[in-house]
Amino acid sequence: MTAQMTSEIFSHADSLPTDEERVVYLRQNHTKAVRELLIHNFNTNIKFLLPEGRPDLRTDEFEPQNSYFPNLGATDDGATLNYEVRKMYLFIEGGHPNLTALKRETLWHELVNSLHPSEADDLWYMKDKKLQEKYKKITHLVAHNSFPEGVQQPEAKPKRDTSGRFTKPEKPKKKKAKK
C-alpha cells in the first residue's frame, strides 16, 4: 500500500470537527513528510534560504508531477514528498553552507517540479511558514500536540486592552506583613 499524500492527510485532518480529533488523526496517519512539513512550518529556529513567495513561472516551465518520470502511467505519482523531504537540509540556514544561492534555487525548482501538484503546493506554503493559511484548522497548537518532540509549544500572544495597547500580565499581589 502506498503512503497517502500530505495534502490528503492535511485536508482530512482539517475537515475534522475538533482539535483533539485532528491530533489523534495526525498521530495515526503521520508520514515522514507530514511530520517534517509541520516541524519546518512551525519551528521559529528554522529559516529557509529561499526567496519568499512563488516565482512567476510560465506554465510550460512549471510542470509538477512526472517531470522526472515521463514514462509513468496516469495513476503513478512520480516522486513523493515522503522520499524527497530528506533534501530539506539543502534549503535551510546551516544545512549546506557551501551551496550557492543559484544552485539552491535550482534544486528547489527541480524538487517542486518532481512532485504531485498538491504536494508541491504544500511545500510552497511550508517554505513561507504559511501552511496554516491553506489548512486553517491545523494550528501551531495542533501540530505541537501531534508531534511534541519536534514542534515547539506555541507562545502566548500578548493581550490588548480596549484602546489597543498591550496589557501587562497581572501579578499576584504580595500581602504586607502585619506588625
In which residue ranges do the predicted regions lie?
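N-terminal nucleic-acid-engaging modules of covalent nucleotidyltransferase systems
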Residues: 1-179
